[in-house]
């Protein structure tokens, strides 16, 4: 088992939506970038939904988030895990998600990217979220969720567009 620690959130006071994963995978931890695995569809999905070009470097990815008032973090701050699969997570500790939500004055929605993020939200945070924040449980963009095509993910994830200016 390897000890894994999440990154700092990408957020600013204009953020309207907080997208939460579970814990960065091995490739992301190695590169110190959210959703760094080339087969993860997160960045391609956002680009499709937002009608933008797929960002090619991490600075452009962060700029895309800020431009569209999106924040990004993980539900877990620490865990032990062999490999990258959420099903291997043990000894988890949550991030301060409710506290971050309270620091984002325009936050309207929290989006869980996948089942483990959804389970962590329900376990640790859902009852303590600010009243105006809606929570959405959406399918994972992970390559492990190969049963859904990018177009299928976009159909489910388009719910976020209602919160964007």
PLM regions: where:
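Short catalytic/ligand-binding loop motif for oxyanion handling, primarily in non-cytosolic enzymes
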Residues: 26-29, 80-83, 118-121, 143-147
